[in-house]
Amino acid sequence: DMCGLFGIRRDRDLTIYDVRVAADAIASIINRLGRCDSSGHVITGPVWEYFADHERMFQPMLRHTPFRENDAVYFRQQLVSRDMDGLLREITLDRANGLHGKTVIHPAHVAAVHALSAVTHEEYHDALDILAGESGGVRASSYRNKMNELKPHRNWALRVIDRAAAFGVTRQGVSFVDLLTALASPGSANS
């Protein structure tokens, strides 16, 4: 365990990226081993070790709005009470930092990792648009909310296509809340 080498155990209110020594080590590993050239490897995110209710020092890390819009306010409360908000934040930060997937030691974490690993309709179509471009340049996303730079975003697009092959692509309008609630409900596979 990386933190164990330094006698550190992060609190459940912190992500691994809040622990500087661990975040710096992850950055070095990704820089050395996670490149998109032929020398790179797939690197998964570190384990999230918390799963039970506890007294919180900091505010929860999940916004209310997406859950209100999906009639899932109680579900959000359940996620927060089980420290899943920290896990969801860390999964998002893992991907932003070049990690793919998550090391899981508790069965309750599997659904969250899978839900946030699915490729959104928007990501998928942006990736296809980038990969279809034959020359450099910039195109507006079909969602009209960002620019897709054909050369700089090419490696990102390739990784999105790989992730789509492993975890699937959501339908248009399906949110992470939809996926989380569907995966948390036994026998539900509609999203």
Where would I find each of the regions flagged by the language model?
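Expand to "…catalyze enediolate/carbanion chemistry for C-C bond making/breaking, isomerization
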Residues: 1-191
